[in-house]
Each structure stands twice: as structure tokens, then as C-alpha cells.
Swiss-Prot record:
Keyword hit for Translocase: yes
Name under which the protein is recorded: NADH-ubiquinone oxidoreductase chain 4
A molecular function (GO) term: ubiquinone binding
Family: Belongs to the complex I subunit 4 family.
Gene: MT-ND4
Family annotation (InterPro entries): NADH4_N, NADH_Q_OxRdtase_chainM/4, NADH_UbQ_OxRdtase, ND/Mrp_TM
Presence of the UniProt keyword Transmembrane helix in the record: yes
GO CC terms: mitochondrial membrane
Compartment annotation: Mitochondrion membrane
Entry EC no(s): 7.1.1.2
Topology with respect to the bilayer: Multi-pass membrane protein
Catalytic activity: a ubiquinone + NADH + 5 H(+)(in) = a ubiquinol + NAD(+) + 4 H(+)(out)
Function: Core subunit of the mitochondrial membrane respiratory chain NADH dehydrogenase (Complex I) that is believed to belong to the minimal assembly required for catalysis. Complex I functions in the transfer of electrons from NADH to the respiratory chain. The immediate electron acceptor for the enzyme is believed to be ubiquinone.
Transmembrane segments: 20-42, 61-81, 93-113, 114-134, 148-168, 195-215, 225-245, 258-278, 285-304, 309-331, 351-371, 394-414
Length: 460
């Protein structure tokens, strides 16, 4: 654990002491080195139950893929932000990268934590840098509104979790995951226990987000700068799914009956948010709603609590993290050139930027879960689990996949195909930096296709 945590903490003096000329290249290189070191975790993830580096930080097959994703994302965020942060004063540039690095530190400690209370503190700590990034570097004035939504939804959701954890500590005497998974199941019988069960899960369902408590997500995504959107889509939503998987161990006997309404909401959310996507005009908003739809599938897979459901959920979380982050980067490159997020105003970009159209195409196909890609693997596993649990769910999940394919192709056709409007003739060309950024997002997705067992979680 420390082989990644210490270099990440060493990023802070690097950011503040590097000469302005070398700031971006140094931090990107440093971030990529950390990302490469973090890949060594994947090697051991499947053989051992829990590779413990200390009593408080450990990595097991469930957290390892998410830790790798977190480390992989920092250099990509730095690469993506370079264009629109460079004109600002050097102090602000340093502060921006510091916030991104602090976010990575908190996330590594959240995914590696063995104590649930440590996980909770880090889960909450990620809120602060994200909030500053959205409200300080967002594009429109609505960013303050988005920040308020984000703050209040997350805080209101996670306060019951704190109370629930303190109660669990009181009854069990420990909050260590290493001990809790071997302790006796709790005899949860009364109404109070049912409220406690809901308190444990509601924070994660708001973070996922479950349909119904998802309103903060489109706002936060649309108003955040590109790095904010990337880290929000790729890792912060996955904190919710990861936390649910960890807590399910403790909540066992009650989940059988109480999970029903949440599964129904998640499945209904797949259809509803997909339908909203079909009517979107705003590029980033469409990608944000598609995230809600995918995470609904993940929530359903986790709440059913079968090995296949868990495996499908973690595969879909990793694949969706890379793909939605790539889509946000592409949306940002289009926004930086045309200064508009409305899809109708920027059509026919394939004629001007053919290689970028290829990146759009791959990202959209991955988003709609094209066969050999890991997205399909995760979705199929979850859909199979849901079908096994109740055959009627195939109506909802089947319609959901159909709508997903519909809006993904709609997004591609609207932004890339069609006649090029007269007002977009003199656009600056794409940089190698942007092509590298897209390659670093999409090549891992294609490579995971060849060895999916590194992200199968416990079930391998």
C-alpha cells in the first residue's frame, strides 16, 4: 500500500517546488509512474485473500481493480486539464493539481481501509476537493447551485451511516472488516434494526446514485471542469458500489426482504434515465444521465448478493469508469473548440477531425456494451443474476440495454455525422496530448477484454 501512498504524498512538494515551465510535464510523469507501480497490485490480487501491508490498510481482490483505476486516472486528469488551466496564474495551477493529488490520496486510503470508520472518513474527505474543483473552476455560474446540491445530497445521505456505524461499533465491539466478515450474523428482528439497515446503505445509494436521489449528479457533472467530471464519473461513483459490497457482509439476514424496493428503483431508473438521455440536447448532461443508468444496473447486481451479481457489478464499475471518463474528455475537447455543449451546434465533426471520430466511435460502442468488451460482460452477468432472481426483470433490463444502444448511437450521429455547419470552419486542430489521453482511456478497456479475471473480485 505504502509503495503507492508515499509517492502520492510526495507529489505535493513536487507540485509546489517545480519551476512553472516544468509543472505539467513533471506531475504527469510522476502520476504515470505511480499508475505503473499500482499495476503490480493486480498481479497478486487473485491468489491471496487480502494482501495486508498494515492493520489499517490492505488490498484484496475487490479493492485492487478500483485502486488501480484511481491511480491510473490522476495523470489522465492532469493531461486533460492542461489546456484550460494553463492561462491562469501559476499559484492557481499548482492549487488545482494539489486538489487532484489530494483526491487520489483520499481515494487510495478509502479503497484500502480495513476499518469501516476510516473508510467513512475518507469517503467524506473526497467531498472537499471535489466541491472546490466544481465551485472554483466550473464553467457557468450555475456551478454554485451544483455545488450546493452535491454537498447537501452527500452529507444528508451519509449522516445516517455515521450513526449506524457507531451503533455497530457498540454492539460488535469492532468495525474492522477483517473481523466483521468472520463474526456471527447479527439477529436483526425489530423495526429499529430495519432503520439501521437503511441507514447503512442510504449513503452509498446516494453516492451511486440510485434513481430518485440522483439529481445532484447531472448538475455536478455538467458544471464541473473536465477533471472534476472525470474523477466523479470514474471513481467517486464507484465508492458507493464498493461501500455497498463491503457493508453487505454485515447486513446479511435483513437484506433478503428489505432490498426489494431498492432493486425495483434501480431497475426503473435504468429505463427512466435512458429515456431522459434520448431527449437530451446537452452533451455532458447526456453522458451524466447514462452514468446513472449504468450505476442502476450495478446497484441491482450488488443488492441481489450472489457471486455473479458481485462479479458483474465490479466488472461494470471498472469498465464504466474508463469509458465514461473517456466520453467526458471527448465532450470537453469539443467544448474547448466550439464553446458550446449543445449537440445541434456542433455536427459533422467527423469531416474535420477524422481520428477523433474514431475515438468517439470506440467510446460510444463501449458505452452501449458491444460484445467482446468488459462492459457487456458485466452487464450480462448482472442481467443473468437478475433473471435468475425473477424472470420478469428481463423486461426492464432488456428495454434498458435497447435504450442504451439507442442513445449511444444518437450521441455519435449527432456529434460526428451530418453536414458540417458553416460556423465551424476555423477550429484549432487536435493535439497529440488529446489523442494520447483518449488512447490511455480506451486501450485499457480493450486490454481488459483479453484478461478479465484481474477484475473479477472475490469470485475468481
Amino acid at each position: 500500500m505504502l509503495k503507492v501512498l508515499i509517492p502520492t504524498i510526495m507529489l505535493f512538494p513536487t507540485i509546489w517546488l517545480t519551476p512553472p515551465k516544468w509543472l505539467w510535464s513533471t506531475t504527469t510523469a510522476h502520476g504515470l509512474l505511480i499508475a505503473l507501480i499500482s499495476l503490480t497490485w493486480l498481479k497478486w490480487s487473485s491468489e491471496v485473500g487480502s494482501a495486508t501491508s498494515s492493520l489499517y490498510l490492505a488490498s484484496d481482490p475487490l479493492s485492487t481493480p478500483l485502486l488501480g483505476l484511481t491511480c491510473w486516472l490522476l495523470p489522465l486528469m492532469v493531461l486533460a486539464s492542461q489546456n484550460h488551466i494553463t492561462p491562469e496564474p501559476i499559484i492557481r495551477q499548482r492549487l488545482y493539481i494539489t486538489l487532484l493529488a489530494s483526491l487520489q490520496t483520499f481515494l487510495i486510503m478509502a479503497f484500502g481501509a480495513t476499518e469501516i470508520i476510516m473508510f467513512y472518513i475518507m469517503f467524506e474527505a473526497t467531498l472537499i476537493p471535489t466541491l472546490i474543483i466544481i465551485t472554483r473552476w466550473g464553467n457557468q455560474t450555475e456551478r454554485l447551485n451544483a455545488g450546493t446540491y452535491f454537498l447537501f445530497y452527500t452529507l444528508a445521505g451519509s449522516l445516517p451511516l455515521l450513526v449506524a456505524l457507531l451503533l455497530l461499533q457498540q454492539t460488535n465491539g469492532t468495525l474492522s472488516l477483517l473481523i466483521l466478515q468472520h463474526s456471527q450474523p447479527l439477529a436483526l428482528t425489530s423495526w429499529g434494526h430495519k432503520i439501521w439497515w437503511a441507514g447503512c446503505l442510504i449513503a452509498f445509494l446516494v453516492k451511486m446514485p440510485l434513481y430518485g436521489v440522483h439529481l445532484w449528479l447531472p448538475k455536478a457533472h455538467v458544471e464541473a471542469p473536465v477533471a472534476g467530471s472525470m474523477v466523479l464519473a470514474a471513481v467517486l461513483l464507484k465508492l458507493g458500489g464498493y461501500g455497498m459490497m463491503r457493508m453487505m457482509v454485515v447486513l446479511d439476514p435483513l437484506s433478503k426482504e428489505l432490498a426489494y424496493p431498492f432493486i425495483i428503483l434501480a431497475l426503473w431508473g435504468i429505463i427512466m434515465t435512458g429515456s431522459i438521455c434520448l431527449r437530451q440536447t446537452d452533451l455532458k448532461s447526456l453522458i451524466a444521465y447514462s452514468s446513472v443508468s449504468h450505476m442502476g444496473l450495478v446497484a441491482g447486481g450488488i443488492l441481489i448478493q450472489t457471486p455473479w451479481g458481485f462479479t458483474g457489478a465490479i466488472i461494470l464499475m471498472i469498465a464504466h469508469g474508463l469509458v465514461s471518463s473517456a466520453l467526458f474528455c471527448l465532450a470537453n475537447t469539443a467544448y474547448e473548440r466550439t464553446h458550446s455543449r449543445t449537440m445541434i451546434l456542433a455536427r459533422g465533426l467527423q469531416m474535420i477531425f477524422p481520428l477523433t471520430a474514431v475515438w468517439w466511435f470506440i467510446a460510444n460502442l463501449a458505452n452501449l456494451a458491444l460484445p467482446p468488451l468488459p462492459n457487456l460482460m458485466g452487464e450480462l452477468m448482472i442481467i443473468t443474476t437478475l433473471f435468475n432472481w425473477s424472470p420478469l426483470t428481463i423486461i426492464l433490463t432488456g428495454t434498458g440495454t435497447l435504450i442504451t444502444a439507442g442513445y449511444s448511437l444518437y450521441l455519435f450521429l449527432m456529434s460526428q455525422r451530418g453536414p458540417t455547419p458553416k460556423h465551424i470552419v476555423g477550429l484549432p486542430p487536435f493535439h497529440t496530448r488529446e489523442h494520447l489521453l483518449m488512447a490511455l482511456h480506451l486501450i485499457p478497456v480493450l486490454l481488459l477484454m483479453t484478461k478479465p479475471e484481474i477484475m473479477w473480485g472475490w469470485c475468481y
